[in-house]
């Protein structure tokens, strides 16, 4: 004690405190100097970044790293000085304190008193231990009882299983016996069942549905039994586990008791030793042990109560299982009775299968071969019969129409009767060789003439190869006869005219060809007889002779482009093809540059492009390869682009470039010719002129300031009927017609050359079907067919195609209304009632029904999945391609099928409501189609001078029709009713919002401007009214006022121009602000900048949609994952999106796209290097650890380019300079000292602070330094 007191008295406290305060002051001064220097370094780095580019900064990186190493050395020196001060303070603190010894003396007295109390508590613990031992003996006895109960339960379960098996076996034996008896009776009654086949076909559907219900019940019963068995096994396993846990706890208690006994003995020994400190520690231990014993006692009691409850539950479960078995036995009996009543199902099924095979062939049986060939499962018999009946009715109606058209037509009478050779000669005499030659194919005629002249020069006409498919047999023989007649007599008028052979005659979509000569085995007599038949024009039995002639000559039909063996292209052909492609690309590029950034009418361009590709038989793959020039790489992308063209203002840069290239092709006749020369299927109707659009009609000239009246839409079916009438008309009916009419009739003479009766009837039937479909289904006007000029194959259109919205009277279809409702309400979660309503569904039938529905209504899988199922396109495709059975699906897997069934129920209910309403049909019956067409044609011929307004619209998909809004709608259509009591109008809020949205979108007006300027409400309230629309009755007073203003807006013609001006002025101001050069512009690595050509457009056009751009580091990380795992899990995708600051959908789409491209490259035998880091595939077993490191480093790398200085616990941030206007234009500094830390910055202490506070602050400072160093390492 004396030594300690002397040591404390010799300490000079004033000197030590003065020294510590001086050191702290120096530390604060050094810290301030360091902050000033770092601030200056940050400013200099920002200035350096603004003055230099990336390349020059790369050169300066070594210098920056040298500065960093010097900075680290200075920090180390500063840390050493601070550690010295801390050591001094610690040495002061480590001096012994004499006060603690004095306080310890008082504590010893208290410990002695506690020791006496501990002895008394030890005696009490002994008594408690005796009680615990007694309770343990009781627990051992209860364990034996539990084992007996478990054995009894096992015995009861085995007996129950044996009873169930015996009952099932008996039922099966009885069912088999009854089925065998019934089969013998069915064999005897087979002949009677054939007579009742018609009745059974009508009842087949009901039998199949009942059979499916029985199968579903059997599956449900089987599932319930399996679930019960599984539940019982699970409960038994839980009970066994609980018993085992109780046993382990008992063993554990025994061990604990033995430990307590040992500790008690040690306590006794320590008492004898008389160590005061051990006695104090033992007291605390005993208190803890007492608590543990009390807790164990409570656990044992609780387990005993739980065991009693479990035994009661098991008894109830056993009784429930017995009851369930009784019910199952009853259900089995019912099923047995139902099977007895349906035992003739197999015989009926076999008979119907035989009927299907006889009537419908391969489509009757659903085997693997037929499914692979047909691509779908077998259709039901009623559907097949209905299709056959419909097909026969259409054929019958077409034949009646053709028969009516043939009456009074001399040419068609001659063709039907078979004497078409006389028709050919008669028309040839009347028309003349000059007019006929003008409608021939010049190339074909010249080729044939050259071949004939070559044969004459070789003097081997008789030895000509008759197998040559390019020579017309009849024309050749006529020429031979004319030559012989010319030698004997003067040339006749008919044979004097040079009748050159026609190579191929085309009619519509069919190719009418001549036949080839037989091999050179015919005798001279046979040839002479053939010539005599051809020259005899007055023979009455010309048809029979022609048939005999075709038999003798063994006539064969061949195509206009005969199939030739595939030969490798020569170098000259490849060079010519490359020159053609280069020439076409140059013309397209010139046409694109001539646009000068002008917006295009995408709908018209897509329509004309599809029409020209179909007319010239150009494949989409060839078009995408040579015309799109890598803008659209795949056939599917081109099909999507043409089938659903988006508005020009909604297209990305890539989409606009695609439509520019399409424009450059369809607006240039030479480019079209060049692509046709590249097409391997160069086949088009040579006798028809194909219309090319003018370049002016493809430009987007719409102006939101102009509001034109809606043109009257007329259903002009003349262009579709005209080709059929040209084929049916006779040249005798209109002898005084104009030159154009005569030309068309003379052209039809060559189209009908060598056409059989069956071919003409089939062509007429096909054309009439097309007219019927387009007349009954289309809601848009077909463009008027312009007149042909001369013999040109192509010409430019003289009529412009203007888009027109549907009239107010034409309402959307049932499917459109349902989809519109689903889009407005969104995807609602399923209720329990809906789950209960569809406990079992036939997934195969439902998927087939959905496929047919989507195909019939032109709904894409993406739209169906997004608005109906809430799934992606890939998930919908998997569901529809490979549906699982209902029993194999989980609760989550059944949800999409339930949504499909609910959707189909809504469609059926809406269709039933529509059937109750009166309908307006164009043709009541198929037989009235010809009369309707004739009436329309007569009206057209009577008023040839009446101007027509023809508007061509692209066929819209269901979603496009929903989103399309009429430009003018009547306000009265948005009023549902009028309240009689108050006289208030009850408005149709959904219709009002639907129309207002369409008008705003059509004119490019934002909801913010609409709400501020017209509704006089906030933008949030306007958006809420648009998105979450309520009914008028459930709306508030303020909301009703807004809906009333919207209704007024629909009938206010002045409001739209005013809002457009506001929108334009707003965009103009914004454009001026953006055009001002900012001193410092923040980089935007995530979003793509606006297109460069948008500055050339008007300000009222909408801005292009910005698309997500992936940075290089994000790409490298995604490629690294793709190499090691092409199908990452959702958790991994979420982690990647979180660390790389990307959306989850972007990450998933990236992997999906690269998987698809990788598979395509693998099919081609190539390696997909785009998804490989540095072009090489390096897999690693520890790729997950490497990925984690990359993700951890991602924020530091993506946010800055320079190395990150690790500073101390405080944060040094550079503030914005005075000349920077906003924080958005602030550029991050090169040197960043931001570091997340929870420690506080050291402040200067006051000179009057106490020594303890100073020491505590120094210790916190040291801890902060250590934490920063640990994070940096």
UniProtKB/Swiss-Prot annotation:
It holds the Pfam family CUT. Residues 591-681, 832-919, 978-1065, 1103-1162 bind DNA. Belongs to the CUT homeobox family. SMART domains: CUT (SM01109), HOX (SM00389). This is Homeobox protein cut-like ceh-44. Residues 101-407, 440-468 form a coiled coil. Probable DNA-binding regulatory protein involved in cell-fate specification. GO terms for cellular component: nucleus. It comes from Caenorhabditis elegans. Asn-1149 may participate in regulating DNA-binding activity by promoting homo- and heterodimerization. CDD domains: homeodomain.
């Amino acid at each position: 004690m004396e030594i300690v007191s002397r040591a404390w008295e010799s300490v000079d406290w004033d000197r030590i405190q003065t020294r510590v305060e001086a050191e702290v002051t120096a530390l604060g001064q050094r810290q301030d100097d360091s902050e000033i220097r770092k601030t200056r370094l940050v400013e200099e780095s920002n200035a350096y970044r603004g003055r230099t580019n990336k390349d020059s900064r790369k050169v300066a990186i070594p210098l920056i790293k040298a500065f960093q190493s010097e900075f680290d050395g200075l920090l180390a020196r500063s840390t050493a000085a601070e550690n010295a001060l801390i050591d001094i303070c610690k040495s002061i603190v480590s001096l012994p304190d004499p006060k603690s010894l004095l306080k310890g003396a008082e504590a010893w007295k208290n410990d002695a008193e506690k020791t006496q109390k501990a002895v008394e508590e030890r005696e009490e613990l002994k008594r408690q231990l005796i009680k615990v031992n007694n309770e343990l003996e009781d627990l051992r006895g209860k364990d034996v009882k539990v084992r007996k109960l478990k054995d009894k339960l096992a015995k009861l379960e085995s007996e129950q299983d044996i009873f169930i098996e015996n009952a099932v076996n008996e039922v099966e034996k009885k069912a088999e016996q009854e089925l065998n008896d019934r089969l013998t009776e069915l064999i005897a009654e087979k002949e009677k069942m054939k007579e009742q086949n018609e009745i059974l076909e009508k009842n087949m559907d009901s039998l199949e549905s009942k059979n499916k219900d029985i199968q579903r019940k059997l599956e449900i019963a089987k599932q319930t039994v399996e679930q019960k068995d599984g539940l019982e096994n699970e409960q038994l396993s839980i009970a066994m586990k609980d018993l085992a846990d109780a046993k382990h706890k008992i063993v554990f208690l025994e061990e604990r008791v033995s430990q307590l006994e040992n500790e008690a003995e040690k306590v006794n020994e320590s008492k004898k030793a008389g160590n005061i400190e051990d006695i104090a520690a033992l007291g605390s231990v005993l208190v803890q042990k007492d608590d543990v014993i009390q807790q164990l006692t409570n656990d044992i009691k609780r387990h005993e109560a739980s065991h009693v409850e479990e035994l009661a539950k098991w008894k109830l479960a056993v009784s429930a299982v017995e009851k369930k078995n009784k019910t199952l036995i009853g259900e089995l009996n019912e099923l047995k009775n139902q099977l007895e009543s349906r035992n003739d199902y197999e015989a009926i099924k076999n008979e119907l299968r035989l009927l299907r095979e006889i009537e419908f062939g391969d489509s009757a049986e659903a085997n693997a071969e037929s499914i692979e060939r047909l691509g779908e499962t077998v259709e039901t018999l009623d559907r097949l019969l209905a299709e056959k009946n419909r097909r026969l009715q259409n054929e019958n109606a077409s034949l009646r129409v053709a028969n009516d058209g043939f009456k009074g037509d001399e040419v068609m009478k001659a063709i039907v009767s078979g004497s078409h050779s006389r028709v050919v000669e008669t028309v040839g005499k009347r028309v003349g060789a000059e007019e006929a030659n003008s409608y021939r194919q010049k190339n074909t005629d010249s080729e044939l003439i050259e071949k004939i002249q070559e044969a004459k020069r070789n003097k081997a006409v008789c030895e000509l190869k008759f197998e040559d498919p390019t020579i017309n047999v009849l024309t050749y023989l006529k020429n031979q006869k004319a030559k012989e007649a010319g030698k004997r007599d003067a040339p006749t008028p008919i044979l004097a005219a040079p009748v050159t052979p026609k190579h191929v005659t085309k009619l519509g979509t069919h190719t009418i060809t001549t036949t080839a000569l037989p091999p050179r085995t015919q005798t001279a007599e046979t040839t002479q007889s053939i010539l005599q038949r051809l020259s005899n024009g007055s023979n009455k039995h010309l048809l029979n002779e022609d048939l005999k002639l075709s038999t003798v000559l063994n006539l064969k039909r061949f195509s206009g482009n005969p199939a030739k063996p595939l030969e490798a292209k020569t170098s000259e052909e490849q060079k010519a093809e490359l020159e053609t492609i280069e020439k076409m690309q140059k013309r397209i590029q010139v046409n694109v540059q001539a646009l000068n950034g002008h917006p295009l009418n995408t709908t018209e361009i897509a329509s004309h492009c599809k029409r020209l590709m179909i007319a010239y038989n150009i494949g989409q793959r060839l078009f995408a390869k040579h015309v799109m020039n890598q803008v659209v790489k795949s056939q599917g992308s081109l099909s999507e682009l043409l089938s659903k063209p988006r508005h020009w203002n909604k297209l990305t840069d890539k989409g606009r470039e695609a439509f520019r290239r399409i424009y450059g092709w369809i607006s240039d006749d030479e480019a079209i010719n060049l692509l046709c020369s590249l097409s391997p299927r160069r086949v088009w109707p040579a006798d028809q002129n194909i219309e090319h659009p003018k370049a002016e009609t493809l430009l987007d000239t719409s102006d939101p300031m102009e509001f034109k009246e809606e043109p009257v839409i007329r259903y002009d079916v003349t262009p579709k009927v005209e080709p059929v009438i040209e084929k049916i008309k006779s040249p005798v009916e209109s002898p005084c017609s104009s030159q154009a009419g005569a030309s068309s009739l003379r052209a039809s003479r060559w189209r009908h050359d060598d056409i059989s009766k069956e071919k003409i009837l089939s062509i007429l039937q096909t054309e009439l079907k097309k007219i019927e479909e387009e007349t009954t289904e289309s809601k848009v006007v077909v463009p008027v067919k312009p007149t042909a000029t001369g013999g040109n194959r192509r010409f430019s259109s003289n009529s412009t195609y203007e888009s027109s919205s549907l009239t107010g009277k034409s309402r959307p279809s049932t499917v459109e209304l349902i989809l519109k409702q689903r889009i407005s309400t969104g995807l609602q979660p399923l209720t329990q009632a809906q789950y209960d309503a569809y406990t079992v569904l036939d997934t195969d039938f439902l998927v087939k029904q959905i496929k047919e529905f989507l195909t019939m209504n032109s709904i894409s899988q993406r739209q169906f999945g997004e608005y109906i199922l809430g799934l992606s396109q890939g998930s919908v495709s998997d569901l529809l391609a490979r549906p699982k059975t209902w029993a194999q699906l989980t609760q989550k897997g059944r949800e999409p099928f339930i949504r499909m069934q609910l959707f189909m129920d809504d469609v059926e209910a809406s269709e039933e409501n529509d059937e109750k309403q009166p309908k307006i049909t164009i043709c009541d019956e198929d037989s009235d189609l010809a009369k309707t067409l004739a009436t329309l044609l007569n009206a057209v011929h009577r008023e040839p001078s009446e101007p027509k307004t023809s508007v061509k619209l692209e066929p819209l998909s269901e979603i496009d029709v929903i989103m399309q809004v009429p430009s003018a709608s009547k306000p009265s259509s948005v009023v549902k009713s009028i309240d009689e009591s108050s006289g208030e109008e009850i408005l149709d809020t959904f219709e009002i919002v639907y129309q207002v949205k369409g008008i705003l979108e059509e004119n490019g007006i934002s909801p913010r401007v609409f709400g501020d300027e017209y509704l006089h409400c906030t933008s949030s309230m306007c958006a809420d009214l648009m998105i979450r629309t309520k009914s008028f009755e459930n709306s508030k007073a303020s909301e009703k006022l807004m809906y009333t203003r919207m209704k007024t807006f629909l009938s206010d013609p002045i409001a739209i121009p005013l809002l457009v001006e506001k929108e334009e002025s707003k965009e103009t101001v914004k454009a001026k602000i953006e055009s001002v050069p900012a001193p410092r512009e923040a980089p935007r690595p995530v979003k793509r900048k606006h297109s460069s050509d948008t500055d050339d457009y008007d300000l009222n056009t909408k801005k292009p949609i910005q698309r997500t751009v992936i940075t290089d580091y994000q790409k490298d990380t995604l490629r690294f994952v793709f190499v090691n795992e092409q199908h990452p899990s959702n958790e991994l995708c979420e982690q990647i999106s979180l660390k790389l600051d990307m959306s989850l959908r972007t990450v998933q789409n990236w992997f999906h796209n690269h998987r698809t491209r990788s598979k395509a490259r693998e099919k081609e035998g190539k390696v997909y290097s785009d998804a490989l880091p540095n072009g090489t595939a390096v897999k690693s077993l520890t790729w997950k650890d490497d990925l984690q490191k990359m993700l951890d480093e991602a924020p530091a790398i993506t946010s800055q380019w320079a190395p990150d200085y690790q500073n101390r616990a405080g944060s040094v941030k550079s503030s914005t300079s005075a000349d920077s206007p906003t924080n958005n234009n602030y550029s991050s500094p090169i040197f960043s000292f931001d570091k997340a830390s929870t420690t506080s910055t050291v402040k200067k202490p006051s000179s009057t602070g106490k020594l303890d506070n100073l020491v505590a602050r120094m210790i916190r400072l040291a801890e902060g330094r250590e934490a920063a160093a640990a994070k940096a390492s």
